[in-house]
Amino acid sequence: METTVFLSNRSQAVRLPKAVALPENVKRVEVIAVGRTRIITPAGETWDEWFDGNSVSADFMDNREQPGMQERESF
């Protein structure tokens, strides 16, 4: 979804369409810069939704190919 970037009191601002608006109780956000990309998330909640979300299925990596144990010199 595209939107507009504009100047407000000599600072950049982004107009969020209703479809992607933040909840009304969000008063502060964090902006994470990844190259030219900007990720806007409610302040203090950056990883909460990720960890609270669905976890992997019970059979995740059941058939993982793992190399055998290596013999190493002790120090």
From Swiss-Prot:
Q: Which domain of life is it from?
A: Bacteria
Kindly give the SUPFAM superfamilies that the UniProt entry links to this protein: AbrB/MazE/MraZ-like (SSF89447)
Q: Does the keyword Isomerase apply?
A: no
The text of the family note is: Belongs to the VapB family.
InterPro entries named among the record's database cross-references: Anti_VapB2-like, SpoVT-AbrB_dom, SpoVT-AbrB_sf, VapB_TA_antitoxins
Specify the protein name. Answer: Uncharacterized protein in traD-traI intergenic region
Keywords, A to Z, come to:
DNA-binding, Plasmid
For molecular function, the Gene Ontology terms on record are: DNA binding
PROSITE patterns linked:
SPOVT_ABRB
SpoVT-AbrB domain residues? 3-45
